[in-house]
Curated annotation (Swiss-Prot):
Species for this entry: Methanococcus vannielii
GO biological process: translational elongation
Name of the gene this protein is made from: rpl12
The UniProt record lists the keyword Ribosomal protein: yes
Keyword Thylakoid: no
Official protein name in the record: Large ribosomal subunit protein P1
Length: 99
């Protein structure tokens, strides 16, 4: 993710996304840059209008938000069941201290 963030930072600063620029941003952030990843990122972004891609991506989550919310309800039930098991196990563990 750091590599993508570096490219986004360069784009927002109106700088060209080059291997050297991405490496400089990563090093400034205290991250050791992997040359292969940097080259792959720059190659993947070649010819891509980042601002346009962000605008298109910003629209997509809005349409998908409703199904995700509907799917979240069953996940909450599972979490509650796990909490009950954890509580029972913790109570059993505490009971063992007094035996």
């Amino acid at each position: 993710m750091e590599y993508i963030y570096a490219a986004l930072l360069l784009n927002s600063a109106n700088k060209e996304v080059t291997e050297e620029a991405v490496k400089a941003v990563l090093v400034a952030g205290g991250i050791e840059a992997n040359d292969a990843r940097v080259k792959a990122l720059v190659a993947a972004l070649e010819g891509v209008d980042i601002a346009e891609a962000i605008a298109k991506a910003a629209i997509a989550p809005v349409a998908a938000a409703a199904p995700v919310a509907a799917a979240a309800a069953p996940a909450e039930v599972k979490k509650e069941e796990k909490k009950e098991d954890t509580t029972a196990a913790a109570a059993a563990g505490l009971g063992a201290l007094f035996m």
